[in-house]
From Swiss-Prot:
The gene is TBL24. It comes from Arabidopsis thaliana. Contains 2 motifs that are conserved in esterases, but it is unlikely that this protein belongs to the catalytically active pectin esterases. This is Protein trichome birefringence-like 24. A motif (GDS motif) lies at residues 153-155. The keyword Membrane applies.
Length: 430
């Protein structure tokens, strides 16, 4: 009887041992399967062509319902972050016109100004070949601790810096620490992270004498020195860890051109028939040649320099001073819209000069100079402009009032915020 009990006890122990070994083996193969499955995702690195490969790092915070903050550090896949489409998004912006009203220029605060439709806020940018994580303000601030940023250019650069400040203000309020006499150049500080963000006004990037009022009305042609860079920004470049530089639309203004301290021609200067008409494309090409050479020289900056392509406007039935309007309320597809000839000329010059500078001045990899080609991305958002709501509640007194339309700048919040999603991804994974 004792022998039988002993035998049963041994058999019971063997069964338990077999179950334990089986559980260990099942866990091991399940883990292997998980690892193999994970390898289907991919890492991302920046290239001078504007195309990127994606490595998604773990987010510092998770926004509710934010399916785009995905696990990262996985495998590499090539992805052009600038080629994609706008898709519906139920989440919307991370800030509002009220929460960031003090930082938004009044002309771009469309909702406060009375814009009645809000559907334009509920679209997000989706690259064709990969997922783009949403902008994570906490993560950005942590990455940029003790760093300095600069946005250099015209009023679109101001539009851009205000977008970034609003997104970051959801974590920490910036403190304005400097402005020039005309409030065109400003600097902010995030004291908890020791991050400095500057906006430097230099609409041509080269030296220019400008004669116009705050509404853009000129009293004389611009005097433009195509071969002299504006020291307002060049003198500060060594102090910036990151800079985003852009220009474009100001070159369409009437201007007198100078090179080597000599008058060489003009654009749209019919009142001076003795001066040769060279066209804005001549001036833009000559100016950007010098700008790109400066940016590509590593001795001129200590950090990463992004050149952002010019942004398209969406004026219809006229332009800024001739009654142009923009009444669209949703995005369009690439097939539904064509780039205007003038925008194509600007864009082609920008790309050509960028590639030339990379080819001639760097080791073919661009060095610290990178390209942000947002032209097509923004071309498909004709609904993102202030339009009639550039001024505060323009139709309160007269529903038929004639108002200045703004189809050049961008509503905040709005589609312009998604530029920051792309920029953060290129920085994190570049």
């Amino acid at each position: 009887m004792k022998l039988k009990l002993s035998s049963i006890s041994m058999n019971h122990k063997n069964v338990l041992l077999i179950k334990l070994i089986s559980a260990i083996l099942i866990s091991f193969f399940a883990f292997r399967l998980f690892i193999l499955h994970s390898s289907e995702f991919s890492p991302i690195f920046a290239s001078v062509t504007g195309k990127f490969e994606a490595r998604f790092l773990p987010p510092e915070i998770i926004v509710p319902e934010n399916e785009d903050l995905i696990p990262q550090d996985i495998e590499v896949e090539k992805c052009d972050l600038f080629a994609g489409k706008w898709i519906p998004d139920s989440v919307g912006p991370i800030y509002t016109n009220k929460s960031c009203g003090s930082l938004i220029d009044g002309h771009q605060n469309c909702i406060t100004n009375g814009r009645p439709d809000l559907d334009f806020l509920y679209w997000k940018w989706k690259p064709h070949d990969c997922l783009l994580p949403r902008f994570d303000p906490r993560r950005f601030l942590q990455l940029m601790r003790h760093k300095s940023w600069a946005f250099i250019g015209d009023s679109i650069s101001r539009n851009h810096v205000e977008s970034l400040l609003c997104m970051l203000s959801t974590i920490e309020e910036p403190v304005e620490v400097y402005h020039d006499m005309e409030y065109k150049s400003k600097r902010w500080h995030f004291p908890l992270h020791n991050l400095t963000v500057s906006n430097i006004w230099s609409p041509f990037l080269v030296q220019a004498a400008i004669f116009e009022d705050s509404n853009g009305v000129s009293t004389a042609s611009v005097q433009l020195h195509l071969d002299r860079l504006d020291e307002t920004w060049t003198s500060l470049m060594p102090s910036f860890d990151y800079a985003i530089i852009s220009t474009g639309k100001w070159f369409l203004k009437s201007a007198i051109y100078h090179e080597n301290a000599k008058l060489v021609g003009c654009h749209n200067c019919q009142e001076k028939p003795h001066i040769e008409e060279l066209g804005f494309d001549y001036a833009y090409n000559a100016s950007l040649h010098n700008v790109m050479d400066f940016l590509a020289a590593e001795d001129n900056s200590k950090g990463t320099v992004f050149f952002r392509t010019s942004t398209p406007d969406h004026f219809q039935n006229g332009e800024w001073h001739s009654g142009g309007t923009c009444k669209q309320t949703e995005p369009v597809s690439d097939e539904e819209i064509e780039i205007k000839d003038v925008h194509k000329i600007l864009k082609d010059i920008e790309i050509d000069q960028f590639k030339r500078a990379v080819r001639e001045k760097t080791n073919q990899d661009g060095g610290n100079l990178k390209l942000l080609d947002f032209t097509r991305m923004l071309l498909t958002r004709p609904d993102g402009h202030p339009g009639e709501y550039r001024q505060f509640r323009p139709f309160d007194k007269d529903k038929n009032a004639k108002v200045q339309n703004d189809c050049l700048h961008w509503c905040l919040p709005g589609p312009f915020d998604y530029l920051n999603d792309v920029i953060l991804e290129t920085i994190v994974n570049g």
